């Protein structure tokens, strides 16, 4: 049989369409891999999900794997997106995983903390990908913390150097210790994007006062207290986020249902915005700023909802105009305790819902910041999901908005 040129062109076109259709059908055009850590099982578990570019819908990748320890509580990823770090609260371990091309995880190293403090509550990677900050509930050798005591008088912030291969080194020495002391009951840690400072939230239930410990940071991990630190921060601050230009810090006050906003002035000093605090839903906890620095999203644990705010790029003021009906919108599963915005395109918000073992997903309107529920959610996850992390699939570029 002999084809004419027209027939050959038609055949080539048909084959191309068939191949494109087959590729689309087999591949949901993944933009991100999402890692959720749950602490119901012993050891804890991590489930990998892929996020669809068009809908934001999540699909499981394989079966859950061990978190490498007991009670995983926080996750962080390297800035090259090749490594995942998990803090296991129950046995004081930090576990490093390599991330495969399909989102698969392989455990490569475990660090058991002792001199660095114990009972981790939060971890965070600096923007350079060279330091991992770990907030521990107790100082070395302590199982309680009493404010004002001679010893065991607070929590501990440890700083681990991260090698070019993603491996964790020995904790940086600060004043002869493998940590710097912070207030009692630390809850969250946040390094600024420019690397100049890091902040730790903590609260004193006896006095009913919350604080942020602020530290000036060097590229090598040395920390020195910022003038005026600790900074007053409501009653029970439990979540911290900062904008990508390192000009503003945002904190959730779990006890007073409010969002506290600060401008960062000279040398990392925090100054509360004059028109704050700002109303949230009930029991706000986890908080995130989108990669462009335009919107804030926070999880309300009691309301089972997400509150959304637009950021005034000049002043840092959060406006709830994108979420005018408060907690009655953006419904999640039961007790959302973790939240993230996808790093691939910054178009989707996900929450980990602790009590009903699920993830909720929302699509962001890039022009307004409003949320709409993603397809087929909520998504069943591992038991008692407590931490979320994500890496983009492929190369994506997100432009940070400047004032």
Describe each PLM feature range.
Residues 1-6:
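N-terminal secretory signal peptides that target proteins for export/translocation
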Residues 10-22:
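Bacterial N-terminal signal peptides
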Residues 22-403:
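Predominantly soluble domains enriched in secretory-pathway, periplasmic, or organellar proteins
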């Amino acid at each position: 049989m002999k084809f004419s040129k027209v027939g050959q062109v038609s055949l080539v076109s048909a084959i191309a369409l068939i191949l494109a259709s087959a590729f689309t059908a087999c591949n949901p055009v993944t933009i991100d891999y999402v890692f959720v850590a749950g602490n119901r099982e012993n050891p804890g578990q991590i489930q990998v999900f892929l996020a669809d570019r068009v809908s934001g819908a999540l699909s499981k990748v394989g079966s859950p794997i061990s978190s490498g320890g007991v009670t995983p509580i926080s996750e962080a990823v390297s800035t090259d997106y090749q490594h995942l770090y998990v803090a296991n609260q129950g046995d004081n371990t930090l576990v490093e995983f390599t991330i495969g091309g399909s989102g698969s995880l392989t455990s490569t190293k475990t660090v058991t903390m002792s001199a660095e403090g114990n009972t981790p509550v939060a971890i965070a990677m600096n923007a350079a990908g060279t330091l991992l900050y770990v907030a521990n509930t107790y100082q070395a050798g302590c199982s309680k913390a009493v404010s004002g005591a001679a010893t065991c008088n607070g929590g501990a912030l440890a700083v681990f150097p991260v090698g070019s291969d993603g491996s964790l080194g020995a904790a940086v020495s600060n004043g002869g210790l493998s940590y710097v002391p912070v207030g009692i009951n630390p809850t969250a840690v946040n390094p600024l994007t420019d690397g100049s400072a890091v902040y730790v939230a903590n609260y004193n239930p006896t006095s009913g006062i919350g604080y942020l410990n602020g530290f000036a940071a060097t590229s090598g991990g040395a920390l020195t207290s910022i003038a005026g630190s600790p900074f007053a921060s409501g009653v029970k601050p439990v979540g911290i986020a900062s904008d990508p230009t390192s000009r503003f810090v945002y904190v959730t006050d779990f006890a007073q249902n409010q969002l506290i906003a600060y401008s960062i002035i000279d040398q990392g000093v925090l100054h509360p915005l004059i028109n704050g605090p700002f109303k949230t839903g009930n029991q706000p906890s986890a908080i995130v700023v989108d990669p462009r620095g335009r919107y804030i999203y926070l999880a309300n644990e009691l309301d089972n909802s997400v509150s959304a705010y637009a950021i005034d790029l000049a002043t840092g003021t959060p406006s709830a105009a994108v979420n005018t009906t408060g907690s009655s919108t953006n419904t999640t599963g039961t007790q959302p305790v973790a939240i993230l915005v996808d790093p691939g395109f910054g178009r989707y918000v996900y929450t980990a819902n602790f009590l009903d073992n699920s993830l909720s997903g929302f699509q962001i309107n890039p022009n307004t910041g409003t949320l709409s529920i993603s397809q087929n959610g909520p998504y069943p996850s591992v038991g008692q999901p407590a931490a979320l992390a994500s890496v983009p699939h492929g190369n994506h570029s997100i432009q940070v908005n400047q004032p």
